[in-house]
Amino acid sequence: APRDFDAARTVSILVAVSRILPRFDYRIEFAASTDVGLVRPSNEDRILCCPELALFGIADGMGGHAAGEVAAQIAIDTVRDEVLRPPAAAILDAYVADPNIEARREVFALLRRVGEAAHAAILEARRTEPSYQGMGTTLDFVVLAHSRAFFAHAGDSRAYLVRPTTTVQLTQDHALYDTLRAAGTPTPARKPQRNPLVNAIGLAGTVSVDTLFVDLSRGDRILLCTDGVHNAIESEASLSRFCAKGGPQDVAEGLLKHARERGGLDNASVIVIDIMDRFVKRADDAGPSSRDLSVLSACPLLAGMSPAAVLGALAAGVEVELGAGDRIPRDVASDLVAYLVLDGAVDLPDGRRIISSGLLFPESLVGARRKGDLPVAAARTRLIRIRKDDFAEVCEHDAELAAALYQRLARYLALGTG
């Protein structure tokens, strides 16, 4: 039966070795760990590990008088129950049978509905129990299907993708400072010590649930963690070093030990999922479609490079989709970002329109910031988002690839076409 993780003890570990999941092409190995820390009287984090549904999730509750742990538990229980329902199974089965863009959008819509159901359940609990007023929770969960990972996110817990060449922060904290930067609002250069949440499950009348997906390969590692873990990590380079040591259990224990050594100021929880050998082979193997690869190969940053080099560069990228009228942020997950346009169209502030194979914010990849208004998606638009630090990390691992990328980037910026 599906198992959620009892986070009541000081430290707990759940490990499964080389599991086969439904609808997923790879074997996995995973570990989950939680620690109350050295300051908090109780643990308000909750973890969901449900390999029978290819579902993993993490929640960090908030609210006094034990209400935070209630909120986190409600969220985790609701996610599990919603993904268990036949309509969810039908959507995931349809995606695995034919993983086209429309089927992918159906999965995204499902994940948003699941997050919204958790939100509604917490609001209902608050309505019926006065002591629960003010409770809420962060929520991150991932569903593994076909050869991909689908993520849903609300709050400031995080999802990371750790690859041999880079560690990618997939989610953006829904906190005030990060949200203002993403919107292009002038903000201090340094993140303030107080950075309140502006979006989480149960926090307000409505919730916004971010969704994204990544193609997976053997050797990839997925990390879900609460802020008690990521606040204790000095940098993504430091996180990469932690994640390079041993298997999932070693990584989970190492991260919690480090959080305690840094003061144990908060509850700390983590799930580590390793992507192992692939036992299902499909015609539509992992990676960009032939059409998307052709579009990307025509982008100024990647033009003239071999398919292998293009895929190497894309290890730093995450595909995102924006609706018509959405502004395209230049700051995501505490870093400058650039975008490669897969399809759709983007209107720039100067009146120009960028279409497939276009490049947005190329200066971000060398740490420069362009002033002015943000571009806007003119239609539903798919893009590959690349954070500056992730791009630099990929380049550090492959000098030949780095030379090719920076040469193209310098030429593009010198021509003033960015």
Residue ranges and their predicted role:
Residues A324-R380, F391:
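Cyclic nucleotide-binding regulatory domains
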